[in-house]
């Protein structure tokens, strides 16, 4: 399968809301997340609400490139980030906020390409992310150069999360 990456503005991401919800529902419905479909709506709406208020919102989408004119190309993956202080304890730091790949497109290098594209386009310096504290996720990010710097259980969550840093 071939794919292409496209940089998305916040406005473009908002226009693709329904596609993003469908993608997140597919990806987060299974292991290790096991989120209900409404979780995808909440995730996307929270991300887009924040995106439109940020000057440094950065996002890439991966589309199937099998169609020569890319008309109606399927959304295979998405990544977004911005500079924030939420995970750093007050120091403005670029945060990888969301990385999602459709289950049928996982294992093809799409997630890594999205990840790398975002980090190149994002603010220079170290970056942070927060993800579930499960080997399936932490091992992947460790292979990609991230290190666990904190473990926590935010708010009303029943699951443990890690904060990871990449220099």
For each feature predicted by the language model, list its residue ranges.
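Conserved catalytic-core motifs of GNAT/GCN5-like acyltransferases
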Residues: 128-130, 142-163
């Amino acid at each position: 399968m071939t794919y292409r990456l496209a940089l998305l503005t916040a406005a473009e991401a908002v226009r693709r809301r329904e596609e993003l919800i469908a993608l997140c529902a597919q990806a987060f419905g299974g292991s290790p997340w096991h989120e209900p479909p409404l979780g995808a709506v909440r995730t996307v709406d929270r991300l887009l609400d924040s995106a439109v208020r940020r000057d440094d919102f950065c996002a890439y989408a991966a589309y199937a490139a099998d169609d020569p004119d890319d008309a109606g190309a399927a959304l295979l993956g998405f990544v977004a980030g911005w500079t924030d202080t939420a995970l750093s304890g007050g120091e403005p730091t670029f945060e990888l906020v969301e990385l999602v790949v459709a289950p049928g497109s996982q294992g093809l290098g799409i997630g890594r390409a999205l990840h790398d594209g975002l980090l190149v386009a994002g603010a220079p310096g170290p970056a942070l992310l927060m993800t579930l504290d499960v080997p399936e996720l932490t091992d992947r990010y460790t292979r990609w150069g991230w290190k666990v710097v904190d473990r926590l259980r935010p708010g009303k969550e029943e699951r443990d999360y890690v904060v990871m840093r990449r220099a």
